[in-house]
């Protein structure tokens, strides 16, 4: 497939705050450098949270008001829009049920599914939501728990595997974030060699800052959390639990939590109830570059992550990450031997607290990990990612 002049469509449900949405934006800019036109499609667009790149080769179209993504109506609408724009490749970076891929392939359009999370992440998410004791009155909690258990029962693991097997058979390329994820999918879905050959590996890009990062010894003694304040995946409440264990040992350190989400009110109440010192909820920030420059350590406390975009962003800025060893993506970024940060056994809060305390008190360790992490980010530079896309397009 000829790359220069190629027209590609990327479809999301919405363009707003989110790692996958940010990666799509970065990818469109990379495509532009290759002479590829990118056409974004979505139901909604939050301009304050997601900015369309100012580039003549990149545009955004919203579905007609009231039209839902991946219905018969929207599938026909998209096929017409693709034909009008000369789209040859559709990239789907979201995990929505889609029964209309055969219709799109019948129009002569190649399909790439881009999985931004760990394999079968939905099972973990459903488990966490089903066991979640919401911070609400008991009657709301009972209703919520009953509803989630019902949904869990109706959406079995085998149904999910069947859906993914069908998806593999309906796309021309299935992208995962790490080689380990490919093996997990092949094993979990029982795929044959032909089906396995459709997989490709594409890590997320990392961008080194324009200016040399501040050395670890000169950084403010500040611990950061950057991400959505949600329970099932990000678990920001663990940050508070861990900080409670170490705050008295680290009197000259502070914690700043950046993000917004459903857990914000609970976190504020928890901070007040436990009277946790030197920890602040800072709210949503559109560009975290300045935040990373002001911190020394990034805490990730997620139950599951596909990649953890904030990990590579922090590493590129010289911030040392610490995270639970909960996925291959996190291991890829931090290193199985904690070469580029600190890995902690899931989900041992005491072990996490011990590692965090050590990291805060040992500036030489922080310096060594910071330098190693910055070098590691070169493996995910735009130049290296570009060559991977060129290989994928050449094989379609």
Positions of predicted regions on the chain:
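N-terminal strand-loop element at the rim of the active site
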Residues: 10-17, 24, 30-69, 181, ...
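Short His-centered aromatic/hydrophobic patch
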Residues: 92-98, 115
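A short, active-site helix/loop in glycosyltransferases that binds the activated sugar's phosphate group
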Residues: 149-197
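Short hydrophobic beta-strand element within catalytic cores of glycosyltransferases
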Residues: 320-324
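Conserved acidic donor-binding segment of nucleotide-sugar-dependent glycosyltransferases
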Residues: 325, 335-350, 358-363
